[in-house]
Regions:
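Mixed-charge (Asp/Glu-Lys/Arg
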Residues: 1-42, 48-210
Length: 210
């Protein structure tokens, strides 16, 4: 009898988290989920496919690996959520596959409390992955207000716009790797792109002021 498995509070939270996230990410075909729960895969919770403009084409432009965590254990101070990720398998998995599909960690707060659920996300960017001490077994992940997805169309659309930026950046990195640029060549390309991005942001700021 002692070997018979039961449903734990954590597994219940993770299952609820998957359900909550699928509800929050309804986006008229932009985000097509294929999530899994109960540790079906050892290092991730499967994927979603991103379709930027489903009214033009239903063909996905990028697959994202995901990890979905439901939790009641977190702290909030001055708008910043802090959560302890007790297993680094997912970021390690993405780090090993960094030139392939990108990864996103989703953390759902209070997933079993109907109406009180909150959804946060963290892109496994190269900078974020480089900040992890993989010699340790856990890490604290901080989420800013900009990394919260609200259960409304405007917030989900903003998240989709962030996904488009990630897809462009990820594609750019892959192109650099495929062309085997030297360090100096890659540096010049990145600096030129940074200048173009800065100029675009400045132009947007001027337009907004006018």
């Amino acid at each position: 009898e002692r070997h018979i498995k039961t449903h734990t509070e954590r597994s219940d939270d993770d299952r609820s988290a998957v359900s909550v996230l699928e509800t929050f990410l309804r986006s008229n075909g932009r985000i097509n989920t294929s999530f899994a729960s109960d540790d079906k895969w050892p290092n991730h919770d499967n994927t979603f496919e991103f379709v930027p403009n489903p009214e033009i084409s239903r063909r996905p432009v990028q697959t994202f690996y995901v990890q979905i965590k439901g939790t009641r254990n977190y702290t909030e101070r001055e708008g910043v959520i802090k959560y302890t990720l007790k297993d680094l398998a997912f970021p390690a998995f993405i780090c090993d596959r960094v030139s392939l599909d990108p990864g996103i960690l989703f953390v759902i707060l209070d997933p079993a409390e109907r109406g009180n659920e909150r959804v946060f996300w963290k892109y496994m960017s190269p900078n974020f992955l480089n900040s992890i001490d993989f010699a340790k077994g856990s890490m604290t992940v901080s989420f800013s207000p900009e990394e919260e997805i609200l259960n409304d169309d405007e917030s989900v659309l903003a998240f989709c716009q962030r996904l488009e930026e990630i897809v462009e950046r990820h594609s750019f990195v892959n192109q650099l790797e495929r062309h085997s640029y030297s360090f100096e060549e890659a540096k010049r390309i990145v600096e030129a792109c940074d200048e173009e991005i800065t100029e675009s942001i400045d132009n947007l700021s001027i337009l907004n002021k006018n």
